[in-house]
């Protein structure tokens, strides 16, 4: 059955809204790169499996960053995959540094940019040093806002800086993150950080921003709700409010509520099924957990039940680059 939303839109608008052309181009590229393997079971089956993986959100696993950020669905799928793969960090009560969270992100996306992880950590840490420890839930919800709304936040940072310096509000802001490189956020002075800007004026500028641009923005009504509760606010105060807002998390739809963050019955059942298939593994894990008094800083590496549709032949080269960056971060 076609949804009412689908029937209400012309075909070309629906295809553009759902980024169908992006997925068709990616599917054809994968088909050409793996044509020898795919020829064994047919092109029709390949396209069926590809678009099933898109619907399930597993198509972004181990892919390059440019693809992961290409569509809102890809971004939401990556957020959901990161949560499901590493929620044991939160269940164990582990606290990790920004660099350690970045290493986890690189396990799913080898070329994930460090700058984006740093920006997410700054929302949590504020004025604290970047090597401070963070809980999984704090980092995850901050990362969700920074990653999903990255272009919006770049423009918001420029608007905030303009308000601090009293510049003309008619300045047009053009995001440039399509290449995967993010413009450095303007340095905010100490006075600006303490005093912030007038919330009502900031709200007007953000309403105009959402009307002008077509990239992903938080629901304007919820942004207005946040800003209506204060007279003045700082840039990072605004980001913290976004990351903790229940309605914005629901509107984005990638993560559960904070109270349900550690519960994923479907994944638990799948992991139990996989563990049972490995002789002696369950007993070994049980014995290890009983012998240990403190939770490990490093979560156990349990094989993900997800499998990429077709492992790219470039994965080894990408992984080598990821290892080098990880080694540098540890030195």
From Swiss-Prot:
UniProt xrefs under InterPro entries: CSTPP1
Subcellular location, record wording: Cytoplasm, Cytoskeleton, Microtubule organizing center, Centrosome, Centriolar satellite; Cytoplasm, Cytoskeleton
Chain positions covered by the region annotation Required for interaction with PCM1: 1-111
GO cellular component assignments: centriolar satellite; cytoplasm; microtubule
Positions of region (Disordered): 292-331
Modified residues (Phosphoserine): 319
Record field: compositional bias (Acidic residues): 318-331
Gene Ontology terms, MF aspect: protein-macromolecule adaptor activity
Region entry Required for interaction with TPGS1, LRRC49, and TTLL1, spans: 1-225
One example of a Gene Ontology biological process annotation: regulation of protein complex stability
Keywords: Cytoplasm, Cytoskeleton, Microtubule, Phosphoprotein
Region (Required for interaction with TPGS2): 112-331
Family that this chain belongs to: Belongs to the CSTPP1 family.
Its biological purpose: Regulator of the tubulin polyglutamylase complex (TPGC) that controls cytoskeletal organization, nuclear shape, and cilium disassembly by balancing microtubule and actin assembly. Regulates the assembly and stability of the TPGC and thereby modulates polyglutamylation of the microtubule, which antagonizes MAP4 binding.
Subunit structure, as described in the record: Interacts with PCM1. Interacts with TTLL1, TPGS1, TPGS2 and LRRC49; the interactions link CSTPP1 to the complex TPGC. Binds to alpha-tubulin.
Record-given protein name: Centriolar satellite-associated tubulin polyglutamylase complex regulator 1
Taxonomic lineage of the native organism: Eukaryota, Metazoa, Chordata, Craniata, Vertebrata
């Amino acid at each position: 059955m076609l949804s009412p939303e689908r029937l209400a839109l012309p075909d070309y608008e629906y295809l553009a809204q759902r980024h169908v052309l992006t997925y068709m181009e990616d599917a054809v590229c994968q088909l050409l790169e793996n044509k020898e393997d795919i020829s064994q079971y047919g092109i029709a089956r390949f396209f069926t499996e590809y678009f099933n993986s898109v619907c399930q959100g597993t198509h972004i696993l181990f892919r390059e960053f440019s693809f992961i950020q290409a569509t809102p669905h890809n971004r939401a799928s990556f957020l959901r995959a990161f949560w499901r793969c590493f929620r044991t960090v939160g269940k164990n009560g582990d606290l990790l540094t920004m660099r350690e969270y970045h290493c986890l992100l690189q396990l799913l996306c080898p070329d994930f940019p460090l700058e984006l992880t740093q920006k997410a950590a700054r929302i949590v840490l504020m004025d604290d040093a970047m090597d401070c420890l963070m809980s999984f839930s704090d980092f995850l919800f901050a990362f969700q806002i920074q990653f999903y709304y990255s272009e919006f936040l770049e423009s918001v940072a420029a608007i905030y800086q303009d308000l601090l310096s009293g510049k003309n509000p008619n300045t047009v802001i053009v995001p440039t993150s399509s290449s995967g490189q993010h413009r450095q956020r303007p340095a905010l002075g100490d006075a600006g950080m303490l005093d912030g800007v007038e919330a009502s004026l900031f709200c007007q500028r953000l309403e105009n921003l959402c009307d002008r641009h077509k990239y992903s923005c938080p629901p304007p009504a919820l942004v207005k709700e946040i800003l209506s509760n204060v007279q003045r606010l700082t840039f990072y105060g605004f980001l913290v409010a976004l990351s903790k807002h229940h309605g914005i998390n629901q509107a984005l739809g990638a993560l559960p509520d904070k109270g349900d963050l550690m519960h994923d019955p479907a994944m638990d059942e799948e992991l139990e099924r996989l563990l049972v298939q490995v002789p002696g593994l369950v007993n070994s894990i049980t014995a290890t957990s009983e012998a240990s008094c403190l939770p490990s800083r490093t979560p156990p590496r349990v094989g993900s039940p997800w499998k990429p549709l077709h492992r790219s032949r470039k994965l080894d080269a990408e992984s080598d680059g990821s290892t080098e960056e990880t080694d540098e971060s540890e030195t």
